[in-house]
UniProtKB/Swiss-Prot annotation:
The keyword Repeat does not apply. The chain crosses the membrane at residues 40-59. This is NADH dehydrogenase [ubiquinone] 1 subunit C1, mitochondrial. Belongs to the complex I NDUFC1 subunit family. Residues 1-27 form a transit peptide. The gene is Ndufc1. GO terms for cellular component: mitochondrial inner membrane; mitochondrion; respiratory chain complex I.
Length: 76
């Protein structure tokens, strides 16, 4: 490469970045309403209901298992 070409490309690297004019750019981000502004109450209800059901089932199964353990080992 010729020295002038190397100097030109090197000077471009050292030159300060030029910001494009405001009229020629457009935002990459759009202003939208946040997702949490309007919760999907059906999904929230199903999630909470499923969680409550699973906890009740877990506790009930645990209590049955404890009773079975006590019965088999003669602790009750």
């Amino acid at each position: 490469m010729a020295p002038s070409v190397v100097l030109r490309s090197f000077s471009r690297l050292l030159a300060p970045a030029r910001l494009p004019s405001c009229s020629s750019t457009r935002s990459k981000f759009y202003v939208r309403e946040p997702v949490n502004a309007k919760p999907n109450w059906l999904a929230v209800g199903l999630s909470v209901g499923a969680s409550v059901f699973m906890w009740i089932y877990l506790i009930q199964t645990h209590n049955e298992d404890v009773l079975e353990y006590k019965r088999r080992n003669g602790l009750e």
